[in-house]
From Swiss-Prot:
This is Putative ripening-related protein 6. It is found in: Secreted. Residues 1-23 form the signal peptide. It comes from Oryza sativa subsp. japonica (Rice). Gene3D superfamilies: RlpA-like domain. Residues 28-57 are annotated as: Disordered. One of its GO terms (cellular component) is extracellular region. The lineage of its organism: Eukaryota, Viridiplantae, Streptophyta, Embryophyta, Tracheophyta. The keyword Secreted applies. InterPro entries: Kiwellin-like, RlpA-like_sf. Belongs to the kiwellin family. Keywords: Secreted, Signal.
Length: 167
């Protein structure tokens, strides 16, 4: 009889420990972090089709590059979101493959903040910067000259540190 009570007490203790451990994991796992078990978690970061959430309330750290979105410029073909070219005077952006999220951010605004001067601007996502096939690293926000101008930055620099978030 004493063994049965001890066994029951032990079983209850194990269940209590398991429920406490589950309660500590209150946040949703990042499907792109390799440990979250998402559909792309087995792929290296640049090949994932999902989008990691912002890592802080100040936005996701990224590298901003300048791109030509008009026909005949270095941006390549028409934008992935709508199959059209866009004016470099428009506030538009292309995101690395993971952040592009299979097109889920198409035609949505993202807030880009310069880490150099603190200025912010909202740009519309119109394209993907392909980080699966070497076109981009997986931390790129590729923007028009108008975005650089709105942030008070010189396009000749080529790359600047920024943060971005969904607007």
């Amino acid at each position: 009889m004493a063994n049965a009570k001890q066994l029951a007490l032990f079983a209850m203790l194990v269940l209590l420990l398991a429920s406490c451990a589950a309660a500590r994991r209150h946040g949703k796992p990042d499907p792109c972090d390799g440990g979250g078990g998402g559909v792309d978690s087995h792929l290296p970061p640049g090949m994932r089709r999902c989008s990691s959430p912002a890592v802080s309330e100040d936005g996701t750290p990224a590298v901003m590059t300048v791109n030509g979105f008009e026909e005949g410029e270095d941006g390549g073909g028409p934008a992935a979101c709508d199959g059209r070219y866009h004016s470099d005077r428009s506030l538009v952006a292309a995101l690395s493959t993971g952040w592009f999220a299979g097109g889920r951010r198409c035609h949505r605004g993202i807030r880009i903040t310069s880490r150099q001067n603190g200025r912010s601007v909202v740009a519309t996502v119109v394209d993907e910067c392909d980080s699966r096939h070497g076109g981009c690293k997986d931390d790129i926000v590729d923007t028009s000259a108008a975005v650089w101008s709105a942030l008070g930055l010189d396009t000749n620099v080529g790359e600047v540190p920024v943060t971005w978030s969904d607007a």
